[in-house]
Amino acid sequence: MIQISDKAQTYFRKLIEREGVPGMGVRLSAVDAGTPRADARLEFAEPADLSGDEWAIDCDGFTLYVVAASVPWMDGAEIDYVTQSTGNQQLTIKAPKIKGEAPAESASMVERVRWVVENEINPQLASHGGRVAVQEVSADGVVLLRFGGGCHGCGMADVTLKQGIEKTLMGRVPGVTAVRDATDHATGDAPYIPRDSAA
């Protein structure tokens, strides 16, 4: 079920009236659904733009069309038009399922480690242009990672590994006993902090 507030409906209705196209509605879709990059897209949709398999939600003065493939990702979504503390008004979309759901506790340790890396750790490392990839998870719970981007060759990679990544993985994934770095940092060509300046 998708909730669209009265304020958001009024906002959309005014925009559609300004366009002056008979039958125009708003189409909602999920972009890169099930990934950390997932986002919601809203766009005007004329009748000729519709494929016919969209879910139609009747609103006050227009129809909200949800792309069929996006429906599971948009379940529980809330669309609102809010006034921020600065006085500016902004359209907000909260779609709690759009990035996917964490694997169940019964999932393999590899699945749970990969989910935490992709959805919690890599978004933080991205602020420095970095990322990590899971190379291996051993039977005794040792996670082997390979750093990339700005983390490849970074002088602070050891600190990031021990104080950030290892603590996060050990706290979020039962059974993880250690996290090790498999990266040859000497080959990094664009580190966030060069190794010789981190000392």
Swiss-Prot record:
InterPro entries found in the cross-reference section: Fe/S_biogenesis_protein_NfuA, FSCA_dom_sf, HesB-like_dom_sf, NIF_FeS_clus_asmbl_NifU_C
Comment on bound cofactor: Binds 1 [4Fe-4S] cluster per subunit. The cluster is presumably bound at the interface of two monomers.
Role: Involved in iron-sulfur cluster biogenesis. Binds a 4Fe-4S cluster, can transfer this cluster to apoproteins, and thereby intervenes in the maturation of Fe/S proteins. Could also act as a scaffold/chaperone for damaged Fe/S proteins.
Single biological process term from Gene Ontology: protein maturation
Presence of the UniProt keyword Lipoprotein in the record: no
Keywords: 4Fe-4S, Iron, Iron-sulfur, Metal-binding
Pfam families for the chain: NifU (PF01106)
Protein name: Fe/S biogenesis protein NfuA
Cross-referenced HAMAP family: Fe_S_biogen_NfuA
MF-aspect GO terms: 4 iron, 4 sulfur cluster binding; iron ion binding
Similarity comment: family membership: Belongs to the NfuA family.
Binding site for [4Fe-4S] cluster: C151, C154
Gene3D superfamilies (alphabetical): Fe-S cluster assembly (FSCA), HesB-like domain
Subunit structure: Homodimer.
Known cofactor(s): [4Fe-4S] cluster
